[in-house]
């Protein structure tokens, strides 16, 4: 036998190298076969419910790192709730209708207009479901625990029927109406868009300053006067029917030198406009308030058959332009509102593909709207005063990345204005985890217009509206419920397979159809109405979930998207918000803080991370950043996270190895019988348990990460485990001192493994497989530990916190001695302490081997004068010398009692007593040399 074999060196086959890319799929397969998710739900039956409702990602393409961050975050929350006494099933979902899938099929050569509608929709459906299957595997590979066999998908018959019923309730309450209001129109998608489908980019546009000649000045202005207007959309001049001024804005009538014409502009803008138009010696002839100009008639710049009326509008400002806005009610929301209020004609001169129509005039017809500025300038002639190229923020179609226009077309709307206050009141009742999120959603609802819910596309849920022979829309409770039942049985494709009459209840009649003939709506619903109905299609309809949901968690872009549409439909139907709490996340940026894009080549695919590091590292990264804001990710950042993971893993490996001969049933020591330092570590660990439990409760992942890493690196590795080796390795295997420390080790190991499970389920499960005395076969089926309180813990903490301050000073003294070559490592030191009365009392009260705690070979507490050479601190001073004696071959301490023993071992008296007591045969025969 060798001397080394008398040490209690930890034994474990738990590997230092995690091998996550290979091991994770093995664990996931085992969990699936063992039905761990289902067993967790069964265990929690009858407990309080917690419903985190999954916002559905769009079923197209592989998941990106933003998807991964979001789904991992949800998984951490749901797992922590499941392990905290809540019944928390998680139903993943997918959004499956909409233009992107139509675009994919178009790129594959599918020509929608040449196919039967039902055949085309089947192709869309098949593609969408293939993407659901692909993404499901992507999410499962992240270790997300969910009801993967029973997800919700917005194209299933039950979901479509639930969506129709949401629409039906809104129709019954009078919230659905048809109008020809201007809407965001995407010529590239040939469809109306909702606000959530708009993104803003900088765009360079041609802006024109031109003048309308006064035709009837109403006794205020002469007919040789011209009203100057500004436009950034020259094509809309073809549909201009009025000029809008601000009632309280001051306008001036001016005559520049050398001009026969007089002009009206806003007084505040005269100087800048004079410079722009090269006007000199401008004479101000008169001033007017805007309301004095109301109802003056001007000529259209080139269309002699059109008059343009001066009207008042609150949207007019003097921030830019001329203080007068040309008004085309067919091409803008403000224009429409003031135009209709003043009886202006609503004219639309651009078709669905962005092409100018015949009513724009022969010079414009057939041309693309964005290419007609030169023609407009030519038509204006000397009415054109200036032209500028301006860069401004402009709305784009978020899918095609092309600019959009406002365009008035017949559309179906949800009247948000009718119940806006009810929505705002509900927002006040929601718990937001960021105050700015509440303000953002509140302001969006407060300021938004009515919701255009119709789309001129194919792949989506039909609007369940019929028309009588006289074109009266029909959407009664009876007809809508009948359609819902048909969709429930056959899916929404039946809308396209049957005639209108066959979709109506048998024997249905309507006074507007004396001949019994009916037609049906060809538009589909906005996809935001699809996902915005999920609270009904899923949360209400699934018995295992509770409505309203406890939590919605998505990216911050969903304030204008899913958070918004879900809120509107839920309040419209039931008068309540669909969520009790709202939590939003920022975007994942690259390592430099730049937005990720394929064109820049700076994207990170979750699959690449899984292959190089493992999903655990991606999961740990999610907790290491503040996801409420934009976060950075790169392979370098993930390498740093991987290093944190390695420290966590190896610390827990040390605990596994050094409790391999510990049976908690027979070997554990009661708290009151632990040494003071072991009690201190137990209390500190329970403080960690409380902090982590609180952080899980408040979804504060970063707090968990920081608390955990700090405890492992500072409290455990740098302190407790550092000196623990002198006990667990050196002392007799069954000694009280060793069992005391093992009790603390085992307690920390078991509980920290449970605390880690929501974040690192694969690693936690691997550790759990080495804990033979724990009852649950999977750690996921256990409960998170509760923090314990102990008698006199405050006094104990105060004492040991004071010691930790003292220890820091001692370490500085040892470091100085190292720098001066007095010692090499601390175990070579004899540390002499010169304490004041308070520190002396502290050290004596610890009742612990101070040399062991400070990892020195010898320690003296001295009285009397402090030597000049001492390292001085407030309340204590130190001197450091090399310890006397020889190095013990067993404990490595320098000890005066170290000598060669008769059994071939050069060891100290303490080690000799352990060997002679526990290894009698070796003492008789001698150690191998």
Curated annotation (Swiss-Prot):
InterPro entries: aa-tRNA-synth_I_CS, aa-tRNA-synth_Ia, Anticodon_Ile_BEm, Ile-tRNA-ligase, Ile-tRNA-ligase_type1, Ile-tRNA_ligase, M/V/L/I-tRNA-synth_anticd-bd, Rossmann-like_a/b/a_fold. A motif ('HIGH' region) lies at residues 57-67. Pfam families: Anticodon_1, tRNA-synt_1, zf-FPG_IleRS. Binds 1 zinc ion per subunit. Its EC number is 6.1.1.5. One of its GO terms (molecular function) is zinc ion binding. GO terms for cellular component: cytosol. The keyword Transmembrane helix does not apply. A motif ('KMSKS' region) lies at residues 595-599. It catalyses: tRNA(Ile) + L-isoleucine + ATP = L-isoleucyl-tRNA(Ile) + AMP + diphosphate. Its cofactor is Zn(2+). It is found in: Cytoplasm. Zn(2+) binds at residues 888, 891, 908, 911. Its main location: cytoplasm. Keywords: Aminoacyl-tRNA synthetase, ATP-binding, Cytoplasm, Ligase, Metal-binding, Nucleotide-binding, Protein biosynthesis, Zinc. L-isoleucyl-5'-AMP binds at residue 554. GO terms for biological process: isoleucyl-tRNA aminoacylation. NCBIfam families: ileS. Monomer. This is Isoleucine--tRNA ligase. It comes from Streptococcus thermophilus (strain ATCC BAA-250 / LMG 18311). The lineage of its organism: Bacteria, Bacillati, Bacillota, Bacilli, Lactobacillales. The gene is ileS.
């Amino acid at each position: 036998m060798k001397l080394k074999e008398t040490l209690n060196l930890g034994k474990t086959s738990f590997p230092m190298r995690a091998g996550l890319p290979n091991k994770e799929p093995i664990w996931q397969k085992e969990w699936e076969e063992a039905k761990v998710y289902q067993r967790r739900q069964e265990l929690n039956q009858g407990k309080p419910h917690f419903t985190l409702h999954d916002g559905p990602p769009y079923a197209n393409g592989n998941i990106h790192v933003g998807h991964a961050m979001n789904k991992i975050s949800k998984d951490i929350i749901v797992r922590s709730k499941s392990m905290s006494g809540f019944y928390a099933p998680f139903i993943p979902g997918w959004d499956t209708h909409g233009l992107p899938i139509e675009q994919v099929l178009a790129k594959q050569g599918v020509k929608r207009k040449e196919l039967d509608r039902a055949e085309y929709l089947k192709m869309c459906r098949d593609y969408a479901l293939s993407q659901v299957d692909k993404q499901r595997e992507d999410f499962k590979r992240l270790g997300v625990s969910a009801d993967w066999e029973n997800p919700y998908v917005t194209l299933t018959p039950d979901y479509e029927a639930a969506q129709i019923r949401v629409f039906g309730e809104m129709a019954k309450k009078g919230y659905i109406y048809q109008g020809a209001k201007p809407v965001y129109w995407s010529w590239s998608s040939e469809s109306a868009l909702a606000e959530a489908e708009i993104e803003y980019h900088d765009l360079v546009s041609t802006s024109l300053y031109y003048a309308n000649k006064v035709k009837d000045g109403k006794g205020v202005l002469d007919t040789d006067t011209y009203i100057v207007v500004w436009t950034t959309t020259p094509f809309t001049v073809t549909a201009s029917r009025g000029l809008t001024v601000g009632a309280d804005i001051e306008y001036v009538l001016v005559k520049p030198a050398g001009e026969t014409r007089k002009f009206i502009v806003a007084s505040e803008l005269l100087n800048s406009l004079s410079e722009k138009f090269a006007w000199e010696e401008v004479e101000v002839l008169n001033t007017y308030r805007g309301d004095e100009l109301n109802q003056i008639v001007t000529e259209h710049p080139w269309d002699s058959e059109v008059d343009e009326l001066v009207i008042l509008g609150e949207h007019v400002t003097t921030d830019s332009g001329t203080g007068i806005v040309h008004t085309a009610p067919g091409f803008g929301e403000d224009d429409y509102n003031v135009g209709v209020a003043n009886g202006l004609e609503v004219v639309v001169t651009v078709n669905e593909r962005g092409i100018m129509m015949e009513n724009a005039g022969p010079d414009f017809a057939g041309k693309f709207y964005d290419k007609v500025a030169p023609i407009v300038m030519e038509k204006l002639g000397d009415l054109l005063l200036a032209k500028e190229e301006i860069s401004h923020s402009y709305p784009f179609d978020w899918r095609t990345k092309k600019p959009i226009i406002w365009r008035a077309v017949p559309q179906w709307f949800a009247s948000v204005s009718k119940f806006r206050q009810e929505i705002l009141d509900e927002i006040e009742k929601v718990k937001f985890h960021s105050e700015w999120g509440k303000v953002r959603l509140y302001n969006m609802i407060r300021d938004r217009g009515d919701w255009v819910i119709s789309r001129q596309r194919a792949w989506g849920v039909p609007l369940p509206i019929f028309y009588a022979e006289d074109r009266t829309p029909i959407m009664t409770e009876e007809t809508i419920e009948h359609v819902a039942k048909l969709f429930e049985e056959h899916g929404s494709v039946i809308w396209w397979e049957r005639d209108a009459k066959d979709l109506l209840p048998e024997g249905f009649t309507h006074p507007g159809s004396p001949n019994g003939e009916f037609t049906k709506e060809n538009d589909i619903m906005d996809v935001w109405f699809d996902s915005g109905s999920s609270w009904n299609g899923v949360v209400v309809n699934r018995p295992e979930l509770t409505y309203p949901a406890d939590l919605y968690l998505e990216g911050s872009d969903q304030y204008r998207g899913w958070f918004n549409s879900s809120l509107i439909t839920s309040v419209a139907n039931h008068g309540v918000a669909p969520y009790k709490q709202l939590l939003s996340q920022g975007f994942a940026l690259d390592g430099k803080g730049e937005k990720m894009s394929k064109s820049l080549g700076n994207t990170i695919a979750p699959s690449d991370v899984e292959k190089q590091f493992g999903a655990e590292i991606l999961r740990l990264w999610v907790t290491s950043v503040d996801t409420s804001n934009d976060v950075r990710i790169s392979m370098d950042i993930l390498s740093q996270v991987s290093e944190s993971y390695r420290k966590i893993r190896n610390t827990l490996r040390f605990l596994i190895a050094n409790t391999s001969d510990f049976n908690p049933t027979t070997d554990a020591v009661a708290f009151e019988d632990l040494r003071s330092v072991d009690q201190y570590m137990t209390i500190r660990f329970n403080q960690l348990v409380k902090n982590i439990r609180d952080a899980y409760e408040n979804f504060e992942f970063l707090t968990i990460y920081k608390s955990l890493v700090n405890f492992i690196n500072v409290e455990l590795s740098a302190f407790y485990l550092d000196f623990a080796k002198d006990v667990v390795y050196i002392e007799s295997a069954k000694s009280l001192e060793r069992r005391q420390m093992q009790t603390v080790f085992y307690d920390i190991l078991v509980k920290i493994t449970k605390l880690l499970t929501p974040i690192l389920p694969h690693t936690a499960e691997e550790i759990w497989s080495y804990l033979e005395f724990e009852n649950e076969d999977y750690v996921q089926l256990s409960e998170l530990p509760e923090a314990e309180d102990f008698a006199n813990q405050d006094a104990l903490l105060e004492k040991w916190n004071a010691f930790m301050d003292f220890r820091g000073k001692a370490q500085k003294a040892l470091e100085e001695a190292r720098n001066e070559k007095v010692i090499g490592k601390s175990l070579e030191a004899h540390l002499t302490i010169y304490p004041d009365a308070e520190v002396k009392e502290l050290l004596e009260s610890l009742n612990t081997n101070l040399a062991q705690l400070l990892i020195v070979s010898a320690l003296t507490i001295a009285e009397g004068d402090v030597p000049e050479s001492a390292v001085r601190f407030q309340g204590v001073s130190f001197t450091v010398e090399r310890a006397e004696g020889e190095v013990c071959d067993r404990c490595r301490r320098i000890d005066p009692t170290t000598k060669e023993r008769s059994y071939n071992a050069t060891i100290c008296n303490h080690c000799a007593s352990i060997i002679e007591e526990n290894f009698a045969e070796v003492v008789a025969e001698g150690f191998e040399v």
